[in-house]
Amino acid sequence: MEKQRREESSFQQPPWIPQTPMKPFSPICPYTVEDQYHSSQLEERRFVGNKDMSGLDHLSFGDLLALANTASLIFSGQTPIPTRNTEVMQKGTEEVESLSSVSNNVAEQILKTPEKPKRKKHRPKVRREAKPKREPKPRAPRKSVVTDGQESKTPKRKYVRKKVEVSKDQDATPVESSAAVETSTRPKRLCRRVLDFEAENGENQTNGDIREAGEMESALQEKQLDSGNQELKDCLLSAPSTPKRKRSQGKRKGVQPKKNGSNLEEVDISMAQAAKRRQGPTCCDMNLSGIQYDEQCDYQKMHWLYSPNLQQGGMRYDAICSKVFSGQQHNYVSAFHATCYSSTSQLSANRVLTVEERREGIFQGRQESELNVLSDKIDTPIKKKTTGHARFRNLSSMNKLVEVPEHLTSGYCSKPQQNNKILVDTRVTVSKKKPTKSEKSQTKQKNLLPNLCRFPPSFTGLSPDELWKRRNSIETISELLRLLDINREHSETALVPYTMNSQIVLFGGGAGAIVPVTPVKKPRPRPKVDLDDETDRVWKLLLENINSEGVDGSDEQKAKWWEEERNVFRGRADSFIARMHLVQGDRRFTPWKGSVVDSVVGVFLTQNVSDHLSSSAFMSLASQFPVPFVPSSNFDAGTSSMPSIQITYLDSEETMSSPPDHNHSSVTLKNTQPDEEKDYVPSNETSRSSSEIAISAHESVDKTTDSKEYVDSDRKGSSVEVDKTDEKCRVLNLFPSEDSALTCQHSMVSDAPQNTERAGSSSEIDLEGEYRTSFMKLLQGVQVSLEDSNQVSPNMSPGDCSSEIKGFQSMKEPTKSSVDSSEPGCCSQQDGDVLSCQKPTLKEKGKKVLKEEKKAFDWDCLRREAQARAGIREKTRSTMDTVDWKAIRAADVKEVAETIKSRGMNHKLAERIQGFLDRLVNDHGSIDLEWLRDVPPDKAKEYLLSFNGLGLKSVECVRLLTLHHLAFPVDTNVGRIAVRLGWVPLQPLPESLQLHLLEMYPMLESIQKYLWPRLCKLDQKTLYELHYQMITFGKVFCTKSKPNCNACPMKGECRHFASAFASARLALPSTEKGMGTPDKNPLPLHLPEPFQREQGSEVVQHSEPAKKVTCCEPIIEEPASPEPETAEVSIADIEEAFFEDPEEIPTIRLNMDAFTSNLKKIMEHNKELQDGNMSSALVALTAETASLPMPKLKNISQLRTEHRVYELPDEHPLLAQLEKREPDDPCSYLLAIWTPGETADSIQPSVSTCIFQANGMLCDEETCFSCNSIKETRSQIVRGTILIPCRTAMRGSFPLNGTYFQVNEVFADHASSLNPINVPRELIWELPRRTVYFGTSVPTIFKGLSTEKIQACFWKGYVCVRGFDRKTRGPKPLIARLHFPASKLKGQQANLA
């Protein structure tokens, strides 16, 4: 209804065209910028009206029309007008001429035909063409009824389009007291519901001022309209105006006033409605009262030039725009040309003022520091977001965008009369169509670029002189430059065009200069393992239970396929072990001492670093927090506080205790029969469940070097007999030891123990179906409830700790279970029932479930059950801690981090280690994990994975090397070797990437997923040796970068070597200059043996079809290699070959054995030689020493330093003050002789000579190096450094069974390295000599060595990478005399230069 009233009222009178010139009066907005800037200081505003209407008699209708427009703009805000001085109103006398020209333009614009509006796509309307048009009926104005401070609103009227009807005979309708006069200068148009943002204008008023303003306004309007505006009724348009809906009083209560309390008048300009209809001249972009001022220079120097960088209230331009205009609207405000619709039909609730009132300074209260254009309202669409530009109903909200300092506006206000002409002009662009991408980008660029960079439309077509006059002055530009501050903007909210190439960053972590960013090089894609569905299925079954039914295949065909696959990998493992055994030495299983806690902390330290760094870090912990050393005599058989069964092993010092299940019965283990041939578990043979319980112990093994037998209990096993008066139990099934949870290693009792090999035996109790927990579901956080408490499900959740005992068959009545039923959360059942500790089921919520599940599960239930079943394990010499873990737990984390600082990541690892120890104390009451040896493998894996920082590889290392479970950890060395040898198939590589150019290898989890289903049937000893040989092979031969392929014993089967060899053949030969210079790359690849070459060519042929399919390369014809030409020997050469020169010295070839024996006889019978100086006599003890020159004591190279050392026997007098060598240590104590004249810091021997030596004499000065060297050479005493075997230095205890070290690794005694000991020559004269390779790490020592030298080093030599302090038992760096790294040598030479 309201729309209908507005439509009808707008057509009551035809538009009046003013014909007479207008008298001078101020424009719509006659106040200056300076007045706006100071308006916030006013605290009182009131309206001063002029009741004398005689001043309007001389005005024409056009003047009255303009005056009415001005009055309507003033009173539309419904706020009191403050009293101002009359200075500003006198500035508008020069505007009459411009307004007269405007009135003529208005007449022309009104008579034009309006354009048809564009129909909205989202809301189509049906046009009724055939319906007759209705004549508009004049209607009396309707007073708005105000109830409770709210104006009643008219209902919505149906939308009907009407054409313009002009009637000149209609009279003007008087304006009611509730609304001001509204005149219509446009044809009839549609009325739409609009939003009233009057609340924004109310921010300048307090709630009390707003209520008083409404009352004063209502009373004042009634009084003045009754008395003073009667003369205007005959002149104005008779079209009634629909009063604008007023905001309710309740909405005004939430308006926040400004601090200065000033009121802000509003002018409602319905620009959005005009933009929608696009009705020609009435909606054109024209400022009817100020368009003539657009071309003025001062108008174009307005303060919007400062808008990009100025702020108000802590908000930037961009932030305010995004806040005021919702959605993605692009608000483009142009300060040079805009629209201002002054149609009287769009003005509501207006009042009329006289010219005298205007001249008295009514508008002087408009001094604002912002762009207060005409109103404070912005119309933004709510129902639908648009990407077009926002429509401004009233532009005074742009006040928030600009803030102008007072001293900057003074330059523009130097001419008051000229500055009065300046009006704020705002362009509002309305998008008709959906903007394209190019338009969007252009709009964004316009919004980002400052207005200072744009030229107004009025500048186009002007001469250079005009442009020169209109440009900014030099003073203005200099002032702008002076005020320019890079810190003015907020960097967090700054909008800048982003391009990767022009990005800049702070160098040096924010403390350095701003430099262009260096784009990160995109890494090459990581290759992936070609996994089949069957492998993935078996992998999942193995995670749940190693003895699952489908592990060997779901049908006969799959079972046969798996048997063939496992036979292939068994052959590969045997072949690899055999070859590496010949080169890298004997690395079969020999037990080390150490606790489970040591190994868990050891895997923390070995993550992502080399072994020599991680081993040094653990040695530092043992040195800083040592355990009090207890002699071995104090470690007798461990006892338990409760009555227990003594399980005795032959030739063993260790005993275990278990609860009195069978009344103090004894268990005797019988010896196993030796088996010369290794036996593997067949794929069709029933293997032991992963939940079996095995009682075992570690024992010392007598090591020999001649025997190569493997004694195993795979086939025959060992029997367990339990003698008891009440009942007798026997073991139903004996299972192979390679699947046992814990393996017992024993020595065979023989008459010749030094000729025997290790014999394995185990005592096992079959407890099937226990702890069958899905490991995958633990990782995925899925909880599976138990189906039956008496039936163990393979999907048992980790919240259920159960064990099913059905391995014993009682000959008599069963006895009571030893499990204490009073333990919380545990229940005891007999005859195969489940011992369970059930926890409430958790909901599935991703990662959060994992944390809740770990907290909810009682891991101590595993310990209680293991101790109830196998007894409490006491600390023995074999299971004693290497480090005082209680002291580490109580120490400061910074102290622990400082101890392992050399390893790297010290702070993070120190926190993890202390967190691990804290959890052990909180969960179990003590730092002890020996009970984990009696826990089933699957449960042990789940428990270890629950610790923070332990992954699958780390857990598998602990299980295989410490707990002796069936596992095969895949680290970086194992994964790289498996890929290069072709054990793991890869998905097709990109065309440009070859196998030998791989920088990244597949994920280790995927490699293990492929290998483990094929290696799961191997025994534990084979898996241990295979793992140990592979990680050593990765350090010595198959390094990540520049592997030693020439010396590799596996190059005939290596795909990496085949790819590199094929690439080297196709490569162009190097230049002669390049051939003469030393190459930093590895040695050139030698041709393999004939059979190896065929295998390598097959690999290349297999890889070619894939390339032919995807790669199209030009055919390159390679010429055949020329055949070697046979040298023709001339007749003269043949004759000269048999010509003998009588003056030539003949070469005498001696029999060295006979020569040695004769030399010994001469020395024995000829006593005269012994009377002289024996040190200068030539003594040849063997044929080898007689035929070869004496080797040097020290051979220095860049990567390694070779030292000739003497091997000291255990009974040597030099070892009287040292610790006794461990019986299982394969290495001996060594003595490294110093070169005469050498010092601890000397790198190369001195070549200087003394002046006394020219006369055959030696000086007595102690500082003379040359003379002292000669004296030491002739003396009977030499200096030396003791080298300690690594196993003896660590007292046989180290994490992960000592796999950190090499089997032939020694440590240099730090004390004798600094101060060498004096050794008589007679004590070392007949000792065997060995070679020790000193270096920084094992890979650098063996880099570039031949196969023969590597083999000699492992079998007859030793390696040394660190020193050892015998007092603190901590690691030390090697002194310069033993080895000086090439990197430090280069730095030292550079410093000297």
UniProtKB/Swiss-Prot annotation:
Subcellular location: Nucleus; Nucleus, Nucleolus
Induction: Down-regulated by UV-B.
Region (DEMETER): 528-626
Compositional bias (Basic residues): 117-126, 243-256
Any one Gene Ontology cellular component term annotated for this protein: nucleus
Binding site for [4Fe-4S] cluster: 1038, 1045, 1048, 1054
Phenotypic consequence of residue 1309 to N: In ros1-2; loss of activity inducing a transcriptional gene silencing
Enzyme Commission number(s) from the entry: 4.2.99.18
GO molecular function: 4 iron, 4 sulfur cluster binding; class I DNA-(apurinic or apyrimidinic site) endonuclease activity; DNA binding; DNA demethylase activity; DNA N-glycosylase activity; DNA-(apurinic or apyrimidinic site) endonuclease activity; metal ion binding
Regulation of activity: Stimulated by ZDP. Stimulated by XRCC1.
Annotated cofactor note: Binds 1 [4Fe-4S] cluster. The cluster does not appear to play a role in catalysis, but is probably involved in the proper positioning of the enzyme along the DNA strand.
Further information: Although strongly related to DNA glycosylase proteins, it differs from these proteins. The DNA repair function may not exist.
Job of this protein: Bifunctional DNA glycosylase/lyase, which excises 5-methylcytosine (5-meC) and 5-hydroxymethylcytosine (5-hmeC), leaving an apyrimidinic (AP) site that is subsequently incised by the lyase activity. Generates 3'-phosphor-alpha,beta-unsaturated aldehyde (3'-PUA) as a primary 5-meC excision intermediate. Prevents DNA hypermethylation, specifically in the promoter of otherwise silenced loci. May be involved in DNA repair through its nicking activity on methylated DNA. Binds with similar affinity to both methylated and non-methylated DNA.
Domain comment in the entry: The N-terminal lysine-rich domain (112-260) is required for non-specific binding to DNA and for efficient activity on 5-meC. The glycosylase domain (510-1073) is inactive on 5-meC and 5-hmeC excisions but retains residual AP activity. Addition of the C-terminal domain (1077-1393) restored partial base excision activity and increases the AP lyase activity.
Protein name, UniProt field: DNA glycosylase/AP lyase ROS1
